[in-house]
Amino acid sequence: MAVTLDKDAYYRRVKRLYSNWRKGEDEYANVDAIVVSVGVDEEIVYAKSTALQTWLFGYELTDTIMVFCDDKIIFMASKKKVEFLKQIANTKGNENANGAPAITLLIREKNESNKSSFDKMIEAIKESKNGKKIGVFSKDKFPGEFMKSWNDCLNKEGFDKIDISAVVAYTIAVKEDGELNLMKKAASITSEVFNKFFKERVMEIVDADEKVRHSKLAESVEKAIEEKKYLAGADPSTVEMCYPPIIQSGGNYNLKFSVVSDKNHMHFGAITCAMGIRFKSYCSNLVRTLMVDPSQEVQENYNFLLQLQEELLKELRHGVKICDVYNAVMDVVKKQKPELLNKITKNLGFGMGIEFREGSLVINSKNQYKLKKGMVFSINLGFSDLTNKEGKKPEEKTYALFIGDTVLVDEDGPATVLTSVKKKVKNVGIFLKNEDEEEEEEEKDEAEDLLGRGSRAALLTERTRNEMTAEEKRRAHQKELAAQLNEEAKRRLTEQKGEQQIQKARKSNVSYKNPSLMPKEPHIREMKIYIDKKYETVIMPVFGIATPFHIATIKNISMSVEGDYTYLRINFYCPGSALGRNEGNIFPNPEATFVKEITYRASNIKAPGEQTVPALNLQNAFRIIKEVQKRYKTREAEEKEKEGIVKQDSLVINLNRSNPKLKDLYIRPNIAQKRMQGSLEAHVNGFRFTSVRGDKVDILYNNIKHALFQPCDGEMIIVLHFHLKNAIMFGKKRHTDVQFYTEVGEITTDLGKHQHMHDRDDLYAEQMEREMRHKLKTAFKNFIEKVEALTKEELEFEVPFRDLGFNGAPYRSTCLLQPTSSALVNATEWPPFVVTLDEVELIHFERVQFHLKNFDMVIVYKDYSKKVTMINAIPVASLDPIKEWLNSCDLKYTEGVQSLNWTKIMKTIVDDPEGFFEQGGWSFLEPEGEGSDAEEGDSESEIEDETFNPSEDDYEEEEEDSDEDYSSEAEESDYSKESLGSEEESGKDWDELEEEARKADRESRYEEEEEQSRSMSRKRKASVHSSGRGSNRGSRHSSAPPKKKRK
C-alpha cells in the first residue's frame, strides 16, 4: 500500500514558513535561502531538520536535502522518496497550492555522480534574493559520504551560514487542531501508564516492602508501553518513550531530563518519577512525586509547589512574554517562602511538540518570545536539596519535590492541562499504618494460624483482656459513637432552640375590594350563576343577593339530574373539613362563619315562550367552573414548585471549541413528554445540556452536592448523576436530581427469536457490546478527567463501590444500593436514591430476627424535622457488611426486632428535645442490657451461660476420666474462649476454671432442688382450696414422687 502524504497540511505549513520568512523578523531578516539536509544517524533522536520534515510531510526522510529559495523549493532524495514527494510536486490546478512556491525534485544517485544536482541547488541559492546568506540548523550534523560531499560543496562556495533554529522552532510551535489531537492522545497514554502501571507498581513495592532498583523499575515502565491495556486504544507501533523514565529517591535527586535512573534501591520517602511518551512523533511529558508517609512540613512544601504551578498556569496566556511568566512565579516565591528561592529549578518548563525540548522556548528570566494560542509546553517545577527535620537515616534527611504536566496555551484564561493525573497530597501520598497497628495485625494473624485441633485450650490460657475480635472492636467503637451522638445532638438542638419555625398561612383571596368593582352583567341581575373568568370568581345568588366566591374557596362541584330537575351542588373549604394533602389547614380568620355547601335546582322542562330550558344555566356554570378551577390549580401548582427556588448565577459560556463534551445522552427527568437526546458540555462555571430540539438545562458547579459516575459494569446504562444543593426548574417542575445517561446494550430481548448457542450473529453482537461498553466507559472517564482538570478538582466525581453494595427497596422496587465516599446511592433506577452521609444522625435496623430472611433499615437525619428514610427488604446476609461499612464511616447504628412508629418518635423528640435527652436520648434503641451500667454484669452472666456446665452424670464420670478428655471438652467448647471478658477469669488457667464450673453447677443444682420443693408445697396448698378437678395435674410432671392429698 502506497504511503500517502497530507497535501493540504503541507501547503498550509509551507505557506506559514514562507510567511514568517518574508516578514523578516529576527534571524529570518538576514537569510536569502534555507538549506536543510538530513542524513542517517540512529543515535540522533531529536533534530530540527527531522522535526521540520515531520511537520511538513508527516514522515522523516533520511538522506534528503531540502533547499527553500525565494521563488522555488528543491528536494533531492532517493528515487523511492521522490516518488513519495511527487504527490505535492504537481501543483497545477490545486487551489491549496496558491501562494506556495513550485517544487523541483532531484533524484540522488548511489554513486558519486550527484555533482550536477548539487550545482543546480547551488545555482538556485545564488539566484534567491542576494544569494549570499543561507539559514541552517547549525547543531544538526549528520555523518555519511552523501552529507559530507554536500557540506563540502556548500563550504567551497563560501556562503555565510546563519542559525535559524530558534525562529523555525517558533514558527512550528503553534499547533494545528490535528497536531493538538495527537499531543492530547500522547498525554492521555502517559497518564494511563502512570496511573495504571507505575503508581500501582510503586504501591505494591511499598506494601510488600520489596527491594527494587530504580533502573529495573524504569525498564518495566518501558516494557509496559508494549501492552495494549495501557495505551488507551492506540497501536503499540505508534507509541515510544520520549526518554528513558527517570525514577529517583533516597536523597539522590537531579531534577533534569538528561539524567538516567541509577541502580540504587528505591527508598520509601519522596519518589520522583518523570516519563514522557511520544505518539506518532508528537511528545508529552509528566512528572510526579509519590510520598510515603510525608511529614507535615513535606506536605506544606508540596502544597506550595502546587500553588506555584497554579500561578504558572494562570500566567501562560496568549500574548504574554515568557520571561514575564517566569518572573510572576518567582515573585510568589519571594513573597511567601523566600527560603525556597535557591531550591527551585532554574527553569520552569519548555516548549514541546515533535521535539521533546525546544531550547528556544525555555521558561526562564531571559526569554523574550511571546506566547501564542496553540503552543504546547511541558511545565516542570521542583524543589531540590530540601532538608527533612524528622529524617533519621542519611537517605531520609534530604528530599526533593518535582511536578510537571503537558499544558496547552489558550486565548484567554489559564493554560489547559493535558496530562490529567491527580496531584494533590491525598492522590500522591501513600500513608502506611504505624508499627503498633502492624504488630497487632501480625499477632492476630499468628494467633489464627495457631488455632487447630487440640491447641485451642492451650491458646485460651494465653488470651489477654486487651485482645479484641472484630465484632468486639466494632461494639467498642459504636459505644464511643453513641456517647458522641447524644452530646452533639443535644448541643445542636440547643443552638437551634431560638430559631422559630414560621408557619405558613393560607393565602386570602379577595375577588373585589368593594361592590362597585363587581361586573354589571344581565345574568347577575337575573339572579343566575355567573363566572367572572378575569377575576376567577363565581357570583352566586344567596337569599336574593349576588354573592362573589373566589374559585380558591370552592372545594368541588357536582351535577346530577333527578326527574325533571337538575341539581348543582357546590362544596366549599371550611375549618374542620378534610383538606387535600397539599392544602394548608390554616384559614385567615377561622372564627368567621363559613358556608359549607350550596345546592341549586333548575327545571329541565322548557316553559312556554322560553328559548332554553332553565337548567342550561347550571350546566354552563358547571362546565366553566371546572375550567377555571383547573386553570387556577395548575397555576398554583407551578407557583408552589417555584417557591424556595434559589436564584442561580448565569452560566459563563466558554467559547473554546476544546471544551469537554459528551454527545448522544438522554436526560432524566425528561424535559418533554418524549425522551430526547442531546449533548452535555462543560463551561467555565457549569454544565449545559442542549437537546436536539434546542432545550437547555444549566447546572452550575457550585450547586452540585454530589457528582456521581456510575460505570456500565453489570448495568444496562452508563450514568452521570448530579445531586444538587438547591433545586432547579425545568419542565415546569423543580428537581434536585438530574442525570445524563446512555444505553449500552439491548434493554429488551426478543423472546420469539430462535437462538443457538454458537450463533455467529449472537457472538458478534456480544463482542460489539463489549467493545461499546469499553468505548463508552473510556469516553465518560476522559470527560470526567477533563472536567476535574477544568475545575481544578473543586468538582470531583464519585464512583460507587460495587463490592460494598447491597440490595434493598427504598421505593417500590428492589435495587442495588452502593456506597460512595460520601453518600449511599442508586443512580441506575428512577427515581434515584441519594443519602448524604454527613447529614445522617444514626441508622436503625428493624425486624432483625433469626427466622426472617430480610430486615429493614431506617435512616434518621440530623435535621429531626426531616422525615426518616426507610429501606425495606434487605437480605440478612448483608447485615454484617453494612455494619462494617457504617462503622468505618463513624456512623452509629442500632438494631431491634420490631418495627417502630417513627412519625410518633420524631414528633416526640421535636416537641420536647430536652426531655428526650434527659431520659437517655437515643439509648432507647439499644438492645436491653447494653446500657453503660449493666454492661459488665451482662458480660459476666453471658460468660457463665456460655461456660461449659456438665450435668450430674457427666460430673460423676469426670472423676474417672483421663486428662485427655479435658482437651476434647475444651475443643468442643472453644467459644468459651471468646466469652472470657472479665479481668478475673481471663487470668486463671483451665483447671481453675473447670473447678469453678463444677462448684457453680453443684450450687445451681441445689438451688433447683430448693425451688422444686417450694413449688410442690405451693401446688399442694393450691389443691386444698380447689374443687378437686385438677388436683393431680400439678404433680403429674414433677420429678418428686406424688404425695397423698391432705384432707
From Swiss-Prot:
The keyword Ubl conjugation applies. The keyword Transport does not apply. Changing L432P: In NEDDFAC; uncertain significance. GO terms for biological process: DNA repair; DNA replication; nucleosome assembly; nucleosome disassembly; positive regulation of DNA-templated transcription, elongation; transcription by RNA polymerase II; transcription elongation by RNA polymerase II. Residues 499-514 have a biased composition (Polar residues). The modification Phosphothreonine is found at T903. The modification N6-acetyllysine is found at K139, K196, K223, K513, K732, K786, K904. Residues 492-518, 918-1047 are annotated as: Disordered. The C-terminal Glu-rich acidic region is essential for FACT activity. Belongs to the peptidase M24 family. SPT16 subfamily. This is FACT complex subunit SPT16. It comes from Homo sapiens (Human). The gene is SUPT16H.
